[in-house]
UniProtKB/Swiss-Prot annotation:
Catalytic function, reaction form: a ubiquinone + NADH + 5 H(+)(in) = a ubiquinol + NAD(+) + 4 H(+)(out)
Compartment(s): Mitochondrion membrane
Coarse class of the protein's main subcellular location: mitochondrion
Protein name: NADH-ubiquinone oxidoreductase chain 3
This protein's GO CC annotations: mitochondrial membrane; NADH dehydrogenase complex
Amino acid sequence: FYYINPREFVNKKVCLDREKSSPFECGFDPLEFLSYPLFIRFFVITLIFLIFDVEIYLLLPMVYLNMSSP
């Protein structure tokens, strides 16, 4: 999200440097097309996290039940 700064219109010295005038987004160029391998890598990491999260969610009650039974 980029908001329009009114000082940019009033200031006569306009910064024409692309690096300084663009927002910083974790090293990514916001005007450049995002490559698919990066998206797929984050998608795979998210799926692995969800699988382990659901596994812990399902196995933790079984551990508590086994500990409480004589």
